[in-house]
C-alpha cells in the first residue's frame, strides 16, 4: 500500500523523510512553544499562558478557548497584522444575539489549506478528471474557491456547482458536463443521486456535515465505490483529516493541528 498523500505532504512541508509518532510529537511541541513564546512577547490574548511546555502532556493544564472568546476577542488572537489577513469567516452562534465568532486566515493559511485539499483530493481525482464542487462559493479564498484551486493544481477540471442548485439544474450538469467525481455534503449527494441518478460519477468526497452510517452505505451502494470522508472546521483552517486508499481511518494534518480523540 502506498504512503498516503497527506503523510507525504507532511514530510515535504517539514523536510523529513519518514513519519513516526516521536517525530510528529517533536514537531507539534516545537511549533506550540514557538507560538507561546511569540504570544508572551507580544502580550496578546494568551499572554498569561506559560512561555514553554515541557511535553504535550502539559496541554491538559491549559484552559480551553471558547466560542465566546472567538466572538469577543478573536482579533486579539492574531499573530500578524490586520493587513496580512486574506479571509475572515464569521458565524453567528445559534441562540445568541451578540457578536458572532470570527476566524481569520492569512495567505499562508489559505495556501496550507489548498495543499491539504490537493493531498486529500489527489487520492481519487486525477489529471483530466471533471469534478462537481457542490460546496458554498463565497468569494476569493472561500471554501468552494479553495477546493476548486486545489483541483486545478492537480490538473483536473472543477465544475463550480455550488450548494443551491435545483434537481433540474443538477441533472443538466450531470448530462452535459459528465463529471466523474463529486465534492459536497453527504445528504445533498444522496438526494441528487436518488432524484437525478449518478450519471458518470464514480467517486465522491463528503464533507461539511455529519454523515450517518446509513447515509454513507446508501451512497456507496449507488456509486459502487467507497466514499472519501473529510473532516474539517473553520478553526483548523477548513481542512483537517481525510482517509487514504486503504479506507481504514483518517489521516490528520498533524503538523498543523493537535487533536484529542
Where are these regions (language model features)?
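Hydrophobic alpha-helical segments that mediate membrane insertion or helix-helix packing
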Residues: 93-97, 151, 259
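Conserved AMP-binding loop of ANL adenylate-forming enzymes
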Residues: 121-156
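Conserved ATP-dependent adenylate/AMP-binding module captured primarily in the ANL superfamily
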Residues: 114-130, 166-178
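Active-site glycine/GP-rich loop and adjacent strand/helix microenvironment
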Residues: 1-23, 27-30, 34-35, 157-261
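Short glycine-enriched loops at secondary-structure junctions
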Residues: 87, 110, 136-139, 187-188
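Acidic/glycine-enriched edge-of-secondary-structure segments
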Residues: 97-112, 148-149, 155-157, 172-180
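Nucleotide 5′-phosphate-binding alpha/beta core
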Residues: 1-92, 99-112, 119
Amino acid at each position: 500500500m502506498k504512503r498516503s498523500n497527506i503523510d507525504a505532504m507532511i514530510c515535504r512541508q517539514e523536510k523529513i523523510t519518514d513519519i513516526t509518532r516521536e517525530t510528529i510529537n517533536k514537531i507539534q511541541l516545537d511549533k506550540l512553544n514557538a507560538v507561546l513564546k511569540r504570544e508572551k512577547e507580544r502580550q496578546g490574548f494568551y499572554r498569561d499562558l506559560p512561555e514553554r511546555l515541557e511535553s504535550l502532556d502539559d496541554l491538559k493544564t491549559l484552559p480551553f478557548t471558547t466560542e465566546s472568546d472567538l466572538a469577543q476577542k478573536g482579533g486579539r488572537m492574531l499573530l500578524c497584522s490586520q493587513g496580512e489577513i486574506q479571509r475572515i469567516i464569521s458565524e453567528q452562534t445559534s441562540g445568541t444575539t451578540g457578536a458572532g465568532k470570527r476566524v481569520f486566515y492569512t495567505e499562508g493559511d489559505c495556501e496550507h489549506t489548498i495543499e491539504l485539499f490537493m493531498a486529500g483530493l489527489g487520492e481519487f481525482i486525477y489529471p483530466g478528471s471533471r469534478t462537481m464542487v457542490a460546496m458554498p462559493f463565497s468569494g476569493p479564498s472561500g471554501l468552494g474557491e479553495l477546493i476548486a484551486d486545489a483541483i486545478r493544481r492537480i490538473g483536473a477540471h472543477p465544475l463550480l456547482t455550488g450548494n443551491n442548485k435545483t434537481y433540474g439544474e443538477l441533472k443538466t450538469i450531470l448530462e452535459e458536463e459528465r463529471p466523474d467525481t463529486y465534492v459536497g455534503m453527504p445528504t445533498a449527494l444522496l438526494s441528487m443521486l436518488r432524484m437525478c441518478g449518478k450519471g458518470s460519477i464514480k467517486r465522491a468526497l463528503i464533507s461539511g456535515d455529519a454523515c450517518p452510517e446509513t447515509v454513507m452505505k446508501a451512497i456507496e451502494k449507488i456509486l459502487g465505490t467507497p466514499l472519501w470522508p473529510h473532516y474539517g472546521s473553520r478553526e483548523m483552517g477548513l481542512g483537517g483529516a481525510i482517509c487514504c486508499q486503504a479506507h481504514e481511518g483518517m489521516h490528520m494534518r498533524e503538523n498543523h493541528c493537535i487533536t484529542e480523540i
